[in-house]
């Protein structure tokens, strides 16, 4: 639905899904004493309900998305095209996760306090990073729509506007975390010592100071994916994996916890070093293709 220009209804269904998830958590865990299984059932059930609601609404409101009898037949060209876009996206997250695992193994050698600090700081950081994922998803849709409509002149304008929004948000997020970071990290730990809170705040602030490079990672990577060049997403993930791996193997053992704090920022910068030239390459390639098509049509 977002690709069709409707982002409000998915948000409504997401809110409904979250409310159902909370209600089912209370019922399954507190009333039915199902424990971890109850939490899993609540999550799956709420997501299933949200998916069904989206499907029903989509079929009623968007005629172009209604599946006809003829469309039930498998189309190998379409399957190949979807796999060409989807498989690289899946591999991207897998490759990035490899670097994170190697880094985490290095952090584990620093002791329980360091592990707890990274865990608490990461949870707060991930909360603020949700906005970057939203910006990326927006640009994936925007890029795909404009490439499909052959309005390549709008790509740069959209990228600029989204980047400015992300930069402003990054500054605001850093200010919030600077003044309230320790308190926010304290919400995710029990029996928090001063050393733990100071370490988690250090981790949080160092990561937040590099949110602007993260803006470009999400905005450009998702946009390139939406433009149909998913392979570049894999390569950017490889750059992130290499950065985190090098930090985990060489930097963390020497510089300790502070070295671990700089792992993700370095990964984001490494990804940007690849993604920014990749965007201009992709855009020029599309422009050349469009010019050839116009010349042939004339």
Language-model features and meaning:
Residues 1-2, 10-18, 39-54, 133-136, ...:
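Short runs within selected transmembrane alpha-helices of multi-pass transporters and secretion channels
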Residues 31-87, 143-210, 251-298:
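Short alpha-helical transmembrane segments in multi-pass integral membrane proteins
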Residues 18, 22, 26, 39, ...:
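Hydrophobic positions within alpha-helical transmembrane segments of bacterial inner-membrane proteins
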Residues 1-10, 115-181, 214-236:
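Small-residue-rich hydrophobic transmembrane alpha-helices
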Residues 19-30, 55, 101-105, 127, ...:
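Alpha-helical transmembrane segments of multipass membrane proteins
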Residues 8-15, 53-56, 71-102, 106-107, ...:
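Hydrophobic faces of transmembrane alpha-helices in multi-pass small-molecule transporters and flippases
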Residues 6-7, 35, 111, 229-230, ...:
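Short loop-to-helix capping motifs
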Residues 27-34, 94-123, 127, 145, ...:
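Helix-terminus/linker motif at the lipid-water interface of multi-pass membrane proteins
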């Amino acid at each position: 639905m977002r690709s069709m220009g409707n982002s409000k209804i998915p948000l409504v269904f997401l809110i409904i899904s979250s409310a159902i998830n909370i209600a089912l958590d209370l019922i399954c865990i507190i009333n039915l004493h199902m424990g971890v299984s109850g939490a899993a059932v609540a999550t799956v059930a709420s997501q299933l309900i949200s998916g069904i609601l989206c499907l029903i609404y989509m079929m009623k409101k968007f005629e172009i998305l209604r599946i006809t009898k003829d469309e039930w037949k498998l189309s190998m060209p379409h399957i190949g095209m979807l796999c060409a876009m989807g498989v690289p996206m899946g591999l991207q997250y897998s490759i990035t996760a490899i670097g994170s695992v190697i880094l985490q193994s290095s952090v584990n050698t620093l002791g329980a306090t360091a592990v707890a600090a990274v865990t608490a700081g990461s949870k707060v950081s991930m909360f603020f990073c949700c906005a970057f994922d939203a910006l990326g998803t927006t640009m994936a849709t925007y890029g795909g729509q404009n490439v499909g409509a052959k309005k390549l002149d709008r790509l740069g304008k959209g990228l600029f506007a989204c980047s400015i929004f992300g930069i402003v948000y990054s500054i605001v997020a850093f200010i919030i975390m600077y003044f309230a970071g320790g308190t926010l990290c304290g919400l995710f730990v029990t029996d928090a010592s001063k050393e733990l809170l100071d370490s988690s705040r250090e981790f949080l602030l160092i990561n937040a100071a590099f949110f602007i490079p993260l803006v470009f990672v999400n905005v450009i990577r998702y946009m390139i994916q939406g433009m149909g060049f998913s392979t570049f997403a894999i390569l950017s993930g490889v750059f992130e994996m290499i950065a985190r791996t090098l930090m985990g193997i060489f930097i963390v053992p020497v510089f300790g916890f502070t070295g671990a704090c700089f792992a993700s920022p370095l990964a984001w910068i490494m990804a940007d070093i690849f993604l920014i030239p990749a965007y201009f390459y992709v855009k020029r390639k599309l422009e050349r293709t469009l010019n050839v098509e116009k010349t042939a049509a004339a």
